[in-house]
C-alpha cells in the first residue's frame, strides 16, 4: 500500500506538458479545479474528464502510474460514495427502502459525481507533480506569489517549504516501508488483532520514523547552509522563467474549458 503512494514523485520527460512553464501548469490546475466544481451534469463531467485524459496522454505519463496512486484512496472514495447514497434525500419514491434506510436516484447520481470529482481532482494534482520538478515548482510558486511580498509575506520561504514537504513524501514513504520490513523480520504483526492492537503496533514504526525525519531535516539544513543559502533575497536563478507560445495557447484552452463548462451549467445541457 505504501509503495502505491506516488504523490510528490517526478517523472522526467520531454513532452509538451513537461516543457510548459511551471506557472502555466499551476494556473491551469486552479482553472481545472474551478471547472471541475462548476460541473453539474453528465456532459460537463465528461468534458472535464476528457480534458484531463488528453493532458495525461500528451504528457506520456503511464496511466497505470495514475491508477496506482489512487489505490490508497479507495477507502475514502467508498466512504464518500456511501455517505452520498444514504444521506441524500430525493424527490418521489425511493429506489430501495429497507429498515428505514432509503436510497434515492438522486443519491446514486450524487455519489457517482462526487467520487468522480475526487478522482479527477487527485489525478490532476498527480499530473502536476509528475511533470514538474521540485525546483521548477518552487520557482513557479514564488513567481506567482511575488505580489504578496509588498505586504511582507515571506513568499520564497513559503514556496520552498511547500516544495520540500512535497519532495519528502516519497522519501518518508520509502523510509516507513524499510522500518516496517525490519520490524516484521523481528516478528512484529501489523495486520492481525483489534484496532487498538494495530495502533499499538505502529509505535515501533513512528518513533524511528520521526527520528529519521529529524535526521534528514538536519542534514538538509546543513547542506543548505554549506551552500550559503540565506533565503530568497538577492538570489539569482539558473533558468529564468519565460512564457512561450504554447503557454499562451494553454491559457486559451483553459479559458475555453471554463467557458464551455459555464455554458453547460447555465443552459443545463
Predicted regions mapped to residue ranges:
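Alpha-helical transmembrane segments and their membrane-interface exit regions
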Residues: 51-61, 75-79
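Juxtamembrane/interface alpha-helical elements of multi-pass membrane proteins
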Residues: 70-188
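Membrane-interface helix-boundary signature
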Residues: 44, 63, 70, 106-109, ...
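Transmembrane alpha-helix interface motif
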Residues: 1-42, 48-57, 143-153, 157-160, ...
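Transmembrane helix-loop junctions in multipass membrane proteins, especially transporters and channels
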Residues: 41, 45, 60-64, 88-97, ...
Amino acid at each position: 500500500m505504501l509503495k502505491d503512494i506516488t504523490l510528490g514523485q517526478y517523472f522526467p520527460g520531454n513532452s509538451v506538458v513537461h516543457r510548459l512553464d511551471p506557472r502555466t501548469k499551476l494556473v491551469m490546475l486552479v482553472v481545472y479545479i474551478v471547472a471541475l466544481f462548476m460541473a453539474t451534469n453528465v456532459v460537463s463531467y465528461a468534458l472535464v474528464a476528457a480534458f484531463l485524459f488528453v493532458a495525461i496522454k500528451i504528457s506520456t505519463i503511464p496511466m497505470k502510474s495514475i491508477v496506482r496512486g489512487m489505490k490508497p484512496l479507495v477507502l475514502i472514495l467508498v466512504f464518500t460514495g456511501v455517505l452520498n447514497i444514504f444521506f441524500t434525500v430525493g424527490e418521489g419514491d425511493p429506489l430501495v427502502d429497507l429498515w428505514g434506510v432509503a436510497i434515492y436516484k438522486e443519491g446514486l447520481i450524487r455519489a457517482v459525481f462526487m467520487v468522480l470529482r475526487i478522482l479527477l481532482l487527485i489525478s490532476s494534482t498527480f499530473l502536476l507533480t509528475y511533470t514538474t520538478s521540485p525546483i521548477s515548482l518552487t520557482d513557479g510558486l514564488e513567481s506567482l506569489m511575488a505580489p504578496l511580498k509588498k505586504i511582507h509575506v515571506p513568499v520564497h520561504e513559503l514556496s520552498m517549504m511547500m516544495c520540500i514537504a512535497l519532495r519528502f513524501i516519497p522519501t518518508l514513504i520509502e523510509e516507513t516501508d524499510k522500518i516496517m520490513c525490519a520490524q516484521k523480520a523481528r516478528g512484529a504483526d501489523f495486520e492481525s488483532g483489534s484496532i487498538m492492537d494495530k495502533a499499538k503496533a505502529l509505535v515501533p514504526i513512528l518513533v524511528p520514523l520521526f527520528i529519521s525525519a529529524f535526521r534528514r531535516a538536519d542534514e538538509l539544513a546543513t547542506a543548505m547552509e554549506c551552500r550559503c543559502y540565506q533565503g530568497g533575497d538577492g538570489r539569482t536563478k539558473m533558468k529564468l522563467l519565460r512564457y512561450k507560445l504554447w503557454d499562451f495557447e494553454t491559457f486559451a484552452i483553459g479559458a475555453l474549458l471554463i467557458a464551455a463548462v459555464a455554458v453547460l451549467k447555465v443552459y443545463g445541457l
